[in-house]
């Protein structure tokens, strides 16, 4: 496999390749949940400059983590149809370039958080970075089919980071937001792994549908979706949200549970794909409903 950057790659394509390394679609949801965490942490809308700087700092570190993930997994990515197009897998961008990009982005993000937000948010963001790039990507993902259950903690951190960026402290409310994403992550990724199981089998990664089968995985999707539905009601009990959120999350949970039950009863790859796509919509609308409910109160 080629590992040296291709000199003849046009500038526009190289810039696009660098952009894709940062996984902008995935990170857009990460930054969105962090922003909602900021909005929920303050009685009114957070100060615009602080909001923007904190969002940028968290985004830059997230981009750095994504780039290093692509570098570490370039050999695995090259074996999978879903990821073989990535620049690191194709050899269009060298490891040195990837490390340079990740270092610059990560350092800039941490500098912003340290200099203009607070040290707690900087350290928590750094811990999230290490959790994703080292604990999840290097250690857990190739070692256990429960990788996403344990490693999902890093992906659940953004709303907590947003909260501490505004308040400088950790409280029960952001921990609830953390719990929601933590429980959302396994059914989200397992649905993807189900309909991409042949890809993962080729990669050698011990994903749950490959190691334990579809039926076992779908049962776990249902269990985690049930726990997620319960956790999604906690914001109401804590007074973080009211009637609008309760109605919205009730409908969202019913649909998600419907997908999970359907997977257990009559699995198909098409249904797993729809479940995966809905899970993204679910989390987006859940956090949007939390924000909308706050606007109604204001």
UniProtKB/Swiss-Prot annotation:
Catalyzed chemical reaction(s): heme b + (2E,6E)-farnesyl diphosphate + H2O = Fe(II)-heme o + diphosphate
UniProt GO BP: heme O biosynthetic process
An MF annotation (GO) of this entry: protoheme IX farnesyltransferase activity
Enzyme Commission code: 2.5.1.141
Subcellular location: Cell inner membrane
Keyword check for Transferase: yes
Transmembrane segments: 29-49, 51-71, 97-117, 120-140, 148-168, 175-195, 221-241, 243-263, 278-298
NCBIfam families: cyoE_ctaB, PRK04375.1-2
Function: Converts heme B (protoheme IX) to heme O by substitution of the vinyl group on carbon 2 of heme B porphyrin ring with a hydroxyethyl farnesyl side group.
Protein name (database record): Protoheme IX farnesyltransferase
